Curated annotation (Swiss-Prot):
The keyword Metal-binding applies. The gene is ispG. [4Fe-4S] cluster binds at C270, C273, C305, E312. Pathway: Isoprenoid biosynthesis; isopentenyl diphosphate biosynthesis via DXP pathway; isopentenyl diphosphate from 1-deoxy-D-xylulose 5-phosphate: step 5/6. GO terms for molecular function: 4 iron, 4 sulfur cluster binding; 4-hydroxy-3-methylbut-2-en-1-yl diphosphate synthase activity (ferredoxin); 4-hydroxy-3-methylbut-2-enyl-diphosphate synthase activity (flavodoxin); iron ion binding. Its cofactor is [4Fe-4S] cluster. It comes from Shewanella amazonensis (strain ATCC BAA-1098 / SB2B). InterPro entries: Dihydropteroate_synth-like_sf (IPR011005), IspG_bac (IPR016425), IspG_bac-typ (IPR004588), NO2/SO3_Rdtase_4Fe4S_sf (IPR045854). Its EC number is 1.17.7.3. Binds 1 [4Fe-4S] cluster. Converts 2C-methyl-D-erythritol 2,4-cyclodiphosphate (ME-2,4cPP) into 1-hydroxy-2-methyl-2-(E)-butenyl 4-diphosphate. This is 4-hydroxy-3-methylbut-2-en-1-yl diphosphate synthase (flavodoxin). The lineage of its organism: Bacteria, Pseudomonadati, Pseudomonadota, Gammaproteobacteria, Alteromonadales. It catalyses: (2E)-4-hydroxy-3-methylbut-2-enyl diphosphate + oxidized [flavodoxin] + H2O + 2 H(+) = 2-C-methyl-D-erythritol 2,4-cyclic diphosphate + reduced [flavodoxin].
Length: 372
């Protein structure tokens, strides 16, 4: 395929969040965050499991109080995905969740107290092999930086991040990743570009408070797409005012569109016009709903007529080109004799897609030099 792998990743160090490798060429991890009350253990566990089901690699949980820390202990015991504890101000909460098996601490060392408290948290993280995420946000910059720069700027976010990085450097702790998020696309992008030149640690990408499901997805795709295309980024979160499950789906869609990492089916579908021989939109929507559980990476083209249908099918694992009453079917770009009745497309396509996905998932790669 044209330009199969055009992106050269920024070199970075390697850390582990639980069993998930981050940086140094590891697959870019997709993260989300719960929006339940952490003290509601049942609701939080249910949401984390829903995120696990759609492929979330890491889930962040806010832990604002000691009661939440005790709830975190119960939550951690009931889920498989690595958990990041989001903590501000009270260093004792960080120490407590470390006891309970947290996989990563999201803290800013400079806002959890004096040097003794910072050292206590860092020493605990070191002893238990827990990485730290430094999280700088354009909406919560330090007062002196706002006085200096008058408003959030890339330089202000960079300076804030480097303050926290310097603290960890002085304590000889290098197992961390950093984010410099902002709600403005250009502010976030330039901040990450500056930071990428300053440190070797992994970077966690995000456009913070991006908005609702539609606008937030677009804003995140634009901002993160710019950075990812430049090779910047090792983990990401799509921040939406929506169900966190949608954050994970959008995250994978962005990675999929850049051919960085694929999970599940990439539907190539026409917007439809008067040439369509079947209802493309309802067909695609129903297939997406039915096939959410398929994790095999594959391209499926569904085109409503023969103008572009055969061409798209040529570069898809499976393809459909609309025809009068019956539509043409392609497998690995090859036209099949079998044709599908336009009144029964969804059932027929679902069966073919599931069979193809199973075949691809179980395919044994041929080693170079193997005989036929």
């Amino acid at each position: 395929m044209f330009n199969e792998n055009p992106i050269k990743r920024r070199p970075s160090t390697r850390i582990y969040v639980g069993n998930v490798p981050i940086g140094d060429g590891a697959p870019i991890a997709v993260q989300s965050m719960t929006n339940t009350r952490t003290t509601d253990v049942a609701a939080t566990v249910a949401q984390i499991r829903a995120l696990e089901n759609v492929g979330a690699d890491i889930v962040r949980v806010s832990v604002p109080t000691m009661d939440a820390a005790e709830a975190f202990r119960q939550i951690k015991q009931q889920v498989k995905v690595p958990l990041v504890a989001d903590i501000h101000f009270d260093y004792r909460i960080a120490l407590k969740v470390a006891e309970y098996g947290v996989d990563c601490l999201r803290i800013n060392p400079g806002n959890i107290g004096n040097e003794e408290r910072i050292r206590a948290v860092v020493d605990c993280a070191r002893d238990k092999n827990i990485p730290i995420r430094i999280g700088v946000n354009g909406g919560s910059l330090e007062k002196d930086l706002m006085d200096k720069y008058k408003e959030p700027t890339p330089e202000a976010l960079l300076e804030s991040a480097m303050r926290h990085v310097d603290i960890l450097d002085r304590l000889n702790f290098d197992q961390f990743k950093v984010s410099v998020k902002a709600s403005d696309v250009f502010l976030a992008v330039e901040s990450y570009r500056l930071l990428a030149k300053q440190i070797k640690q992994p970077l966690h990408l995000g456009i913070t408070e991006a908005g609702g499901a539609r606008a937030g997805a677009v804003k995140s795709a634009v901002g993160l797409g710019m950075l990812l295309a430049e090779g910047i980024g090792d983990t990401l979160r799509i921040s939406l005012a929506a169900d966190p499950v949608e954050e994970v789906k959008v995250g994978f869609d962005i990675l999929k569109s850049l051919r960085i990492r694929s999970r599940g089916i990439n539907f190539i579908a026409c917007p439809s016009c008067s040439r369509q021989e079947f209802d493309v939109i309802s067909t695609v929507n129903e297939l997406e709903r039915r096939l959410e559980d398929v994790t095999t990476a594959m391209d499926v083209s569904i085109i409503g007529c023969v103008v572009n249908g055969p061409g798209e099918a040529l570069v898809s694992h499976l393809g459909l080109a609309g025809g009068h009453k019956k539509s043409g079917y392609y497998d690995d770009g090859i036209r099949q004799k079998e044709r599908f009745d336009n009144d029964n497309l969804v059932d027929a396509l679902e069966a073919k897609i599931r069979a193809k996905a199973s075949l691809m998932a179980n395919r044994i790669p041929v080693q170079e030099g193997d005989a036929d």
